[in-house]
Curated annotation (Swiss-Prot):
Belongs to the class I-like SAM-binding methyltransferase superfamily. MenG/UbiE family. Keywords: Menaquinone biosynthesis, Methyltransferase, S-adenosyl-L-methionine, Transferase, Ubiquinone biosynthesis. The keyword Transferase applies. It is an enzyme of class 2 (transferase). This is Ubiquinone/menaquinone biosynthesis C-methyltransferase UbiE. Its EC number is 2.1.1.163, 2.1.1.201. Pfam families: Ubie_methyltran. Gene3D superfamilies: Vaccinia Virus protein VP39. One of its GO terms (molecular function) is 2-methoxy-6-polyprenyl-1,4-benzoquinol methyltransferase activity. Methyltransferase required for the conversion of demethylmenaquinol (DMKH2) to menaquinol (MKH2) and the conversion of 2-polyprenyl-6-methoxy-1,4-benzoquinol (DDMQH2) to 2-polyprenyl-3-methyl-6-methoxy-1,4-benzoquinol (DMQH2). The keyword Transferase applies.
Amino acid sequence: MGGQKTHFGFSTVNEDEKAGKVAEVFHSVAKNYDIMNDVMSAGLHRVWKHFTIHTAHLKKGDKVLDIAGGTGDLSRGWAKRVGKEGEVWLTDINSSMLTVGRDRLLNEGMILPVSLADAEKLPFPDNYFNLVSVAFGLRNMTYKDAALKEMYRVLKPGGTLLVLEFSKIYKPLEGAYDFYSFKLLPVMGRLIAKDADSYQYLAESIRMHPDQETLKQMMLDAGFDSVDYHNMSAGIVALHKGVKF
């Protein structure tokens, strides 16, 4: 790892440079991340996350790992599902995002363990969690295969991985979606977050992310069984689910 080339949006960079460049993006957008999510998706990200939470079928006392948990939307939902006897870890590789998420949850009276963690080298034991989730984070990881194998490792047998991520939209809508992503989104980033470049990268990173079938195969290759996905909003996002047997 490290000597090869990879993509950073539409640009090509050394593999060992990508993580630092992605970190710069999320340090920049952290404070405005929630409001930009609402503006960018017209609030739909809340619906997508709500669906994800209801898909999990958690029970009281379960253990959950929220990878790239950012500002804590999923962690909040998981904590309500598993109760005080459960365990939910909010993790992110970016300290700015993790701080915003931790503080936001504290302001709501919710105390959860947090960890500044790299998904490709998770600091958790084997066979520990009932559920691992990653929402809008996998596409930013340099070594996605390694991250998926780590998620598999920390899951208990019978545990579930949920990957909520931007995906490939239905073909008839591609033109309109491209116009929105590459013309309007950077303008909104400049006006609201004073940062057009970061939102240009986010739009480009979506286009470079594996499509639904490719990600399904990647999860199978990482060891998961019963892998399937559910498209939402005409394929703008997809929720992939895999089980460790």
